[in-house]
């Protein structure tokens, strides 16, 4: 950890290294959300269209995007482990950035499904290496008693939201309006900017932070790791081949099914590992039990929220009025632009929630109440999406304002769940499993998208109203259940609120 002189040259009163990490994450999120804004459209756009895509069925395209999201969050476990045991955070971040860049370059090439799967593999692995470690690097810029720490993280989050906000406008406009591969090229350029900002800034401002692994492997452990990794890769390749041989025509669907199972099983293994560990005390085991309903609730929340890049993206392209007339002026909307509504409402609503919590102080709702209310709002956002179909049927086009309203309500729900969930994950973590509990929070998102890979193909015009209604009601019911069982959960949580 770096000891910083508060009189040195700063970035908004913060360590200069924060500017480097701010810029790196800004451009990384720009590339990630820019690519994600057009990915599903590229997958199902006709191969004969002027702006040709891969021509996959919409159901399969949505499943691929979902499983991609699941694996991105699953890979954060690998990224954290590589930084802690092998390379150190600094080199892991840079290597991750290189892999992401190569992935976007692969997407920019017109080689069909082959380049798609190579690209997604590289981006998944690279994001897993970069995402968890760059947040840890922010923390290492400060001493434990530095009062600037929380403000520094807030500034860092602003960089994330800024990159997420402008990406759909730039990458989406070029990708959908001109050429998908050109859009992916812009995402690659964004990652090149991220790499340059990180490489240059790290050398100048924090050359020693994260340089070495915090828990390095000895020679014997490295040898065992190489042997294990080799075996895993061989088994994976054999499994890949067997899945293909079983049914070449259904290979993609079968592969998605296998990955969905992995995404669901991994968190179960993690929970069993922690519950059965001799390093976990009885009091910690009670707190871990309290985390289970929160984890399951988080899966429901993220399952709805993450459908913005699949179901909501498809609805926006096929069902919303893309040429609305407002105040006498006719506008054109690229469907990918809807993806900016998520970060936009996060930016707009965050100060309101911060002010409310500051005003309430110790009187603010408990974690369980916030979770429950957040889930109810998230479920309500999908009930809103039933109204266009109920009022005017599902064959025509509806106002884009339905999506604006849906995102506004859903992001209010996210601000009640996401920051609280991240915080409570650390508070309820057993001492011996602090980092693993942070991974568990990411795994909730991973599991939700693994489930989405199975349920999003159900969505079509004929099922639109029922899908939104059932999914929304599930979210509301889970929120209500949390409020009902609040007392026993709080009892298990002990002094954590």
Curated annotation (Swiss-Prot):
Keywords: Cell membrane, Membrane, Peptide transport, Protein transport, Transmembrane, Transmembrane helix, Transport. Signal peptide: none annotated. Residues 1-36, 84-92, 135-154, 201-224, 274-293, 355-372, 445-497 are cytoplasmic. It is found in: Cell membrane. The keyword Nucleotide-binding does not apply. GO terms for cellular component: plasma membrane. Gene3D superfamilies: MFS general substrate transporter like domains. GO terms for molecular function: peptide transmembrane transporter activity. Its main location: membrane. CDD domains: MFS_DtpA_like. Residues 56-64, 112-115, 174-181, 244-254, 313-335, 392-425 are extracellular. InterPro entries: Dipep/tripep_permease, MFS_dom, MFS_trans_sf, MFS_Transporters, POT_fam, PTR2_symporter_CS. The chain crosses the membrane at residues 37-55, 65-83, 93-111, 116-134, 155-173, 182-200, 225-243, 255-273, 294-312, 336-354, 373-391, 426-444. It holds the Pfam family PTR2. GO terms for biological process: oligopeptide transport; protein transport. It is a multi-pass membrane protein. Proton-dependent uptake of di- or tri-peptides. NCBIfam families: yjdL_sub1_fam. Belongs to the major facilitator superfamily. Proton-dependent oligopeptide transporter (POT/PTR) (TC 2.A.17) family. This is Di-/tripeptide transporter. It comes from Lactococcus lactis subsp. cremoris (strain MG1363). The gene is dtpT.
